[in-house]
């Protein structure tokens, strides 16, 4: 990450963590804190960002994810798609260089998925941030990714450009099976 080998025992992982954001499939918001407090918490504690600057950035991020009107709401008052967009805003508040997404749409109702994917597409298009996305949303991967890594049983089976992976037939039988099943729906 950012030129450092995480597997190298000499690498100080704690120095790298502040440059890497993570969006989990189950949001992990603090239920006892408002939306804006959830977004402002890590930058205040980790980065020691001043309150006014922190609040201003949090509101900009809420606007970016289409939820500025929910700043004072509690997580229990939000839909799953709204919670996931708040989780994305919370990660962006740390101004990471790399953002990791772990199946960000898997816990969502189908009608909420597009809202989250639209936010992610906007990040991919309008920022210079590296995004690593674990997803089964192949349409999203095809539209946004510049590289596709296909994994099965914990092993990398394919590592190609998006054009090659989706344009040509994948080189492994397992990837071809997967692609034929999802294209059949």
Model-identified regions with their sequence ranges:
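C-terminal boundary and immediately downstream tail of ABC-type ATPase nucleotide-binding domains
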Residues: 163-185
């Amino acid at each position: 990450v950012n030129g450092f080998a995480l597997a190298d025992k000499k690498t100080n992982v704690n120095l790298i963590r502040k440059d890497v954001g993570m969006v989990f499939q189950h949001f992990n918001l603090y239920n006892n804190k408002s939306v804006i407090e959830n977004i402002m918490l890590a930058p205040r504690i980790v980065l020691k960002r001043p309150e006014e600057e922190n609040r201003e950035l949090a509101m900009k991020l809420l606007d970016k994810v289409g939820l500025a009107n929910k700043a004072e709401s509690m997580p229990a008052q939000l839909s799953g798609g709204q919670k996931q967009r708040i989780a994305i805003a919370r990660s962006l508040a740390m101004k990471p260089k790399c953002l990791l997404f772990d199946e960000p749409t898997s816990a969502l109702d189908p009608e909420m998925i597009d809202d989250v994917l639209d936010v992610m597409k906007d990040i991919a298009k309008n920022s210079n941030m590296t995004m690593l996305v674990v997803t089964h949303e192949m349409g999203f991967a095809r539209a946004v990714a510049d590289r596709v890594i296909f994994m099965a049983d914990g092993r990398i089976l394919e590592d190609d450009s998006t054009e090659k992976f989706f344009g040509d037939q994948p080189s492994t039988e397992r990837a071809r099976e997967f692609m034929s099943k999802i294209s059949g729906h």
